[in-house]
Amino acid sequence: MNSVRQSCRPKHQVLILKCYPRFQKGVQSVKPNSSELSYLLYYASTRRSKLQKVGAFLEKRAARDVWRGKLGNVQVTLQILAALIEKVPRDLPLYARSILTVLDIVLRSREISMVEETIPTFELFCRHQDSATLTADHEYIIQYRELVGTYASFASTETPVTTKTPMSAPMALRWRTVGLKAIKSIVTSEILSTDGAKQLNVVIPVILQNLYASGDHRLSPLQEKAKSSERLEREQFRRRRMSISTVQTVDTIDGNGDPESASGSAADADMMAEMEARVLALRCLEKVFSGTNRVQIRFATSLVLSFIVSRRPPRTQEKQRSANGKTDGNWATNLLEVIANWSPVQDRFIILVTLLETLVERPLVDGQLEPQLTLASMMDWLLGSSVNLIGLSVMDVLIGLLQFVRQLLQLGNGTQTLVPHHGLSTLIKPLPQMDETAATNSQTNGENEKAPTADSLRHELLELLENCIGNLATHVYYGDQVSDMIRTIVIRIKPSPALEGENAHHESESDNAIQKSSPSRSDYTAESYFSSSAARITALRSVKDILVVANLRKSTSGTDPDARNRVPLHVWEGTHWLLQDPQWEVRNAYVDAFLSWLQLETKKSDLRVPTEHTRVSKMGNRRDTSDIPERLARRIVSTAPQEENVAACHASSFLQLLHLTIFDVVSESSTTESDILRLYLLLVNLVEHLGVNAARYTLPVLMKLQDTLPSSVSASKALHIGSLVHGYLLALVEKFDLEGTRPAAEIINEISKRKKRGVWLDKIQLPPRPLHHIQPSLDTVIEQASLPQPDKNIYSRFTSLEELVRQIESTYNSSYVSPPISPSNSPGRSFSIPSLGLNNSTNPHVPAGSQLPLHVKEHMLAPWSKEACLDAIEKEKAKTSSLSGSRTATGAFAAGLNALNMSAYNSGPGSPTGTAPSASNRQDRPVSAAYAPTGNLAGFQKTRRQSIPERRVSPAASSRDSTVRVNELRRVLSVINSSNVRHPSPLRGRHRVDSTVSSTESMVSDNLSFSDAGTAAADRPLSSRENLTAPRGLNRYHGGPNQLHGDFEPEYIPPVPPLPSSLAIPGGFPADSRSGSSVTSPSHSPPRSDRPSTAPGRPARTHSKSKGSNASTLRQSRSLSRKKSLDTSLHERSERRATDLNGIPSGHSHGYSEDLGDIGIAITADTTEIAPHTQDRADTSSQWSRREASRTLSFGRRVDMDKLLEGLSAPNDDQQPNGTGEVSGIKIASSGVEGSSSLTRMGKKPSFQSMNDEKKASYSRKTSLLSPGAAPWNRLSSDRGGIGPPPY
């Protein structure tokens, strides 16, 4: 009967039924028959139409087995489905709904043994399912979500599973473990990215319920166990897959257990099982945040935050962290930090942004601020942690926090009091100490409070928001971030409407000078302002927190606090009016923030007076042939000094406005003792950290206040002013170490006299009293009747101001220490690099920044008045606008630089006039980068010849020139003198063209004599294209002409090889060389010797056009690539210079060195190939010219280009056969020219004569010296003048 029934069944049903084993009793784990299962899988994989029928039959079989309670058959059914998924995963959508139906049937049985068997099948299903199927089939989506909800309900701790039997603790733990394993498969599935919102909304709360423990907030042990369990899983995956027929023995099962739990009690085993469940929940949460889907991370973070807010974790640990510096935190903060570490580095900022959005979007209800407190404490912890939030928009987060602070301050109609109840000492927070000795008094009243009030909650939330703003400085990702943060807060501080009405007449007096708010305030709405006293206090305390955190903590980006740019002084622009705020708390908070800036953001370099940077002309950039990125970098770099000038102008305006406000505060009749002490503390700290930069403004103001002493209305006002003035003068004596001088004795005697007469404030002392000790409640009550009336006898004026300023100047000048010069890693703010020239003078050079500028000294001695101060501020404002946006100012700076350079030529120490530059130029003008020396190396005169070409460094050089180049260092170490320096060859290759020099490839030497420079400057106007700079050798001849003659000793000059009598220059000479009038000038040439005239150290030959005129010509550089027609000029010069000579004379033979002396060409090549003779040159000139093109020439002396150009422009008789007219070469007779200082002009083309026997012999002897190894001066091809392929 059974066989008949089987024969009527379809084949797929028969194959399925054969997989179930017959005998299942006594077997712990039932598995399908392996051979029958293999055939079933083959049958289903080869016939896709049978997959749906197989799934439908397994549904019926599972329903019947679950109803009958046959656990073994249920296990076989689930294993058949798992094997089918592994065999045909591509066709999973055909039978996916059948799998979900089978799983749902088993889960509804509420039998833990059956439900546990569904986990392996569900894991495979989640691993292989397709997300496209989920989006296409709506019924499938609903069925899958119901299955996810069922598994999540098993893992929930709040809604236990309803079973037929009572639930025990171990059984509940088993249900939770099953649910968590299924959730782990859900969060690792690809389908989560498609339907993540619905699934995460169900899964995340359940995970957090299992992870949350009210008594244990440590997550580090769980993380360690999670890593170990994950490692074990990886090892199991690496093992060979076991056969389904393999039976595990008891020893194998026991070996997988935990020996600790086996040896412990039942309670220990339950505790270990609970720990395993929490570890599993932690791994599930890690899978959610370790993905790269930002939408998923954002949504999951919002769910985590909602769960944490609902749990209301304690905030006591947060208070302890803010007081002690660090602590373990609570469960919520640790969880948030762990989640941030799990997330990808580039996506971690999403967590903080989501946290801020959750905080801002939650409605504010007075008295119900617990959720905001929890979120703010978590944000404070995350910002203060070491988690790198790269990609975070710090400014957006800052603006969002400021807006939330404004909303919080408006809560309760703005009538709430933000001062804490336990005293005023916490309003001014002292700077944290590194030795951790700060008192922790924030917990004194925490135990006594029964229930927090609305005011206390607002105040606590406000403190947390201030800490959040300050901790933003931990994450510094660009140089000016801290400055931008402070400026963003400062520009939102606005006076209250009442204060604006009181000071309306003051604003009319200084309409443009005194601005109580930044001009950029118009960009913001009125709601963004901090106009109340509480808002201003909060903003100023936030500024202080930013400064403290930025300096005491290392940035999470991996850089030290020194890596960022310092906060400049001009960020405080527009805040001086806060010294006149009606509320003393606001005045204290402002002084506290400003003192924090002075202590943390100033360095020793701020004690020096900043030098103004000048811009050089950009006209030379038109001929700049450097690449575009280099020019762009140079353009950006060159604007930095002008930005520094603008910042210096802003800082000067702020200091003047600050001192003007101090004058107004002291002059008011309502000024109290605490106000005087606060101003005294501010002034002393200003001079302590800014030096003369602050004293230049303070001294005139205090002298003006001193003049008002006899006319003071009340005796208390005279007491305040007198104590403030002389207390500050005593601080100057202490700062500049003036003890023992006459002004110091006068100041100390006056203070002693006033103390004896009882007209001195005892609280004016050095060091000044701390700010938290200056409070209105501690002011001393002064009786007017007990004070004598102010007169000239009691309050003696300080009259030694000039002597005091002179002593300050002396101390300033003597305290200068020249800093060592070292190459910087990147172009900083100082782009004007002094040239590495040598100073051979006996007097040491004093840098420009070492002396106190004259205008600073005059400013300290000048009388002060309100009108003059406002006029000076207006001038500074006009100068700032001109420097920042006007092209006229740029031209003026360039013209001024050219004028200074020309004055350096005409009035230098080595000039014929003998006049030195003025003292004002030496002190006030920055040292030019073209000739500023770096040291006195006058003792090294005997130097070797240098093989490195000289370069001029311009102030607007590119970023590559911002560091000291290796070539420049070698030039300094070799102590090169300009008299014997070989200059770069124009044919060697192109060097980088500088922005202020037209070409470094000029054929005219740049080592000009002083008389040449002076004459040229006087004879012709300065061209806009010729940006003259001082030559490198200018500051080397301070010793005068005698020293100059002493440098040209022949024994120190290396030998130079002789030249062939015939020379062929490929391509000819450029046609744009300057051919000005040639006149003679007194030359500082050394005595004649047997050395060739083409030697590099030899001065230029004197040219004689007329015997009666003596002058020199300053030849300008011309680029070799310029093209210019000379037909007209050559014709005019031919008619004007008629002579009786037809070519090069050959009357006197003065050797080879005289042959090319008139032309001025020096060949420094070690020639290995001899030029052909004259008779063979006609047919081999083309090949010989190409061979000669590989030779390296160096034009180290001036050249008479008229003579060469006329000869080259003449028609050539030796035309090539192809008719190209190529110049084959120039043959020059070996006979010299009579006299070494005369030059014969040619009126016609030169005649090239043939060589006789005597000349041929001389030629052969001379050319034999040019072969390699023939002379000891032969150099390698890598040296200058060596043989080698040209760089072009």
UniProtKB/Swiss-Prot annotation:
List compositional bias (Polar residues) regions by residue number.
511-522, 906-921, 995-1012, 1212-1221
Q: Where is the composition biased (Low complexity)?
A: 1073-1083
Q: Which GO terms describe its biological process?
A: protein localization to plasma membrane
Question: Biased-composition ranges for Basic and acidic residues?
Answer: 1124-1139, 1174-1190
Pfam families tied to this protein: EFR3 (PF21072)
A GO cellular component annotated for this chain's UniProt record is: plasma membrane
Q: Which SUPFAM superfamilies match?
A: ARM repeat
Mind telling me which InterPro entries this protein's record contains? ARM-type_fold (IPR016024), EFR3 (IPR039786), EFR3_HEAT-like_rpt (IPR049150)
Region of interest: Disordered? 500-522, 816-835, 906-964, 980-1155, 1167-1195, 1208-1288
Q: Which family is annotated? A: Belongs to the EFR3 family.
Name it.
Protein EFR3
Q: Which gene encodes it?
A: EFR3
